[in-house]
Regions:
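Short helical patches
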Residues: 4-8, 317-321, 405, 488-491
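Membrane-interface alpha-helices
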Residues: 88, 315, 488-496
């Protein structure tokens, strides 16, 4: 019997929540289903048709996302673990070289904690590459100090800023690993994160990328904004990405912590780093979604056919990057991805990649602590969302039908939301339709409470779930307008 055929009893009996909480989940699904039926009746006979139709489809989407993420989602790490352990016996596991890449600019307050989490990783066969993207604060000095403490660190200082994407591209040319890890410089990973990701990759040759589970650092003791963002990020990972993982089609491998199989990402690295959009060279936004879209769009019949061409283009990147200094094992000793690595790639099967999320892979995320910085972040994210319409939206129909249906429905509702909110806040009061207004506000509160209760079920004892309804109201009545501003100012490249 092979390792793949082995099954561990503890993995098959793994439960995210106990039976009592599962019963509450079923009640939640039932409640959403009842609300969906009520909204259909209200749509046909009582409320404003436009608002009622929009509200009906939001509940339809909510029910499907919850149902699939509850019933169908299985953490890929639980399956991967079962491949290497059976009846208390641990089997051998391949330990490929992993390249951890951290691009950083002006993060003197976070970079030490971030890099230290990489050093503390329990996975031994790793290399750590930090690219200082022209920082003007003390980031460079901190990195040099850490280099003295940990000689194995590979640090590149760029004389001027080239942006996150090109910084990662430069690091990828140095990286020798079979697996790339990308982590934002204001985040810190759990010590076992890499170990778990490697097991997932080893469990399924067709997995091309993995996204981790983020939680806001310091949320329990932070201000209300941190608490609201924490419950939101938690749900966007476990519920939304959990649903997408059920179809092996996660739409965004977050910059906070993601893992990529080298052969899945390298063919697109150069095109991603030099993304063009609306006539703009090196489009600054949509870093995470755009890279994910490249991998999602790989055709099964020709998945890696262009890898040689893409790697050849990427191999010239360091000639265009303003390198100020680098440390031992840096640029001069790198192994070009256009060499033997490409030959090995061409001998492998060509297929479409699976992209999954693992709840077991943890990362602490740094988020804005003030409202103005939060709004600026959300504007950037909406510019990324607009770009993703042409990237992910253009290829997602190739993925499983129902996943594509829910994806296109979700983005349609997101674009329509400002118009619905405008009608609810302005036009319906003028026409005296108070019933529709009241029911719409009730629907927003209901959705927020559903997500809040879900958070509480998975985090018993935590009071943060109370902040989810507040965040839902903010996303509905504040964030909705940002998509319009983001579209108008999409050519404005200012990051802050």
């Amino acid at each position: 019997m092979t390792i793949v055929q082995e099954t561990i009893k503890s993995s098959t009996t793994y439960k995210e929540v106990d039976q009592k909480r599962w019963f509450v989940r079923y009640l939640m699904l039932g409640a959403v289903g009842i609300i969906l039926a009520i909204k259909l009746y209200l749509l046909l006979f009582i409320v404003d048709f436009t608002v009622g139709l929009y509200s009906f489809f939001t509940s339809f989407l909510l029910f499907n996302i919850l149902f699939i993420s509850y019933i169908k989602f299985k953490d890929p790490y639980i399956y991967a673990k079962s491949m290497y352990v059976s009846n208390g016996i641990t089997y051998g596991i391949s330990k490929p070289l992993v390249s951890i890449i951290v691009p950083v600019k002006n993060e003197e307050g976070n970079i030490r904690n971030c890099v230290q989490s990489c050093i503390n990783s329990t996975y031994s066969n790793k290399e750590i590459i930090v690219v200082n993207d022209g920082s003007t604060d003390d980031t460079a000095a901190i990195l040099d100090e850490m280099k003295k403490e940990e000689p194995s660190l590979n640090i590149i200082h760029l004389s001027e800023s080239v942006g996150k994407k090109q910084a990662i591209e430069a690091a990828s040319e140095i990286a020798k690993g079979e697996i790339f890890v990308s982590m934002d410089s204001d985040c810190d990973m759990a010590c076992d994160a890499v170990e778990k990701a490697v097991k997932i990759f080893n469990s399924d040759r067709k997995i091309g990328a993995i996204s981790g589970h983020g939680r806001v650092r310091g949320a329990t003791t932070g201000n209300a904004l941190l608490k609201m963002q924490d419950v939101y990020i938690d749900a966007s990972c476990r519920i939304l990405k959990g649903m997408e993982t059920s179809f092996c089609s996660v739409t965004c491998c977050a910059g906070s912590l993601s893992f990529f199989r080298r052969e899945a990402v390298m063919p697109y690295m150069h095109d991603w780093a030099h993304d063009k959009f609306l006539g703009m060279e090196n489009f600054k936004f949509a870093t995470d979604r755009r890279l994910t879209a490249f991998i999602l769009g790989t055709k099964e019949s020709s998945g890696l056919e262009d890898s040689s061409k893409s790697d050849d283009s990427a191999s010239n990147i360091m000639h265009n990057i303003p390198v100020l200094a680098h440390c031992k094992n840096g640029l001069d000793t790198r192994t070009s991805s256009s060499g033997s690595d490409t030959k090995n790639t061409n001998n492998k099967l060509r297929y479409a990649w699976k992209i999954v999320y693992s709840q077991s892979i943890k990362v602490n995320v740094g988020v804005p602590e003030t409202f103005p910085t939060l709004i600026r972040q959300q504007i950037r994210w909406r510019k990324s969302f607009i770009r993703s319409l042409f990237a992910t939206g253009g290829i997602y129909w190739r993925r499983p039908f129902y996943a594509a249906l829910l994806y296109y429905l979700q983005i349609s509702l997101k674009f329509l939301r400002p118009l619905i909110v405008l009608k609810v806040l302005i036009f319906l009061p003028l026409s005296g339709d108070l019933i529709t207004i009241l029911l719409y506000f009730s629907g927003v509160l209901f959705a927020g409470m559903i997500y809040g209760v879900d958070f509480r079920l998975r985090n018993p004892g935590s009071s943060l779930w109370l902040y989810r309804p507040l965040f839902t109201f903010m996303t509905t009545f504040v964030y909705s307008w940002l998509i319009i501003y983001a579209a108008i100012t999409i050519k404005k490249t200012a990051w802050r």
